[in-house]
UniProtKB/Swiss-Prot annotation:
Localization: Secreted
Propeptide, chain numbering: 22-51
Disulfide bonds: C56-C62, C57-C67
Record-given protein name: Alpha-conotoxin EIIB
Organism: Conus ermineus (Agate cone)
GO CC, any one term: extracellular region
Domain-level remarks: The cysteine framework is I (CC-C-C).
Highest taxon of the lineage: Eukaryota
Family, similarity comment: Belongs to the conotoxin A superfamily.
Keywords assigned: Acetylcholine receptor inhibiting toxin, Amidation, Cleavage on pair of basic residues, Disulfide bond, Hydroxylation, Neurotoxin, Postsynaptic neurotoxin, Pyrrolidone carboxylic acid, Secreted, Signal, Toxin
Amino acid sequence: MGMRMMFIVFLLVVLATTVVSFTLDHVLGLASEGRNAKAIDNALDQRDPKRQTPGCCWHPACGKNRCGRR
């Protein structure tokens, strides 16, 4: 293998590693963020009876209906 071919293989390995790493971080990060938001929201609901509205999520990271908040 020539020097140019080795450099191209190196670049392809770096690119593939970066793409896989970013994809896994993105997918796993969103999943864990949603679980954490739900756990935080449930804990807050237990402490504050005014927040116990079905279908609402008061945590900013939650993707559900935010019950009229801006």
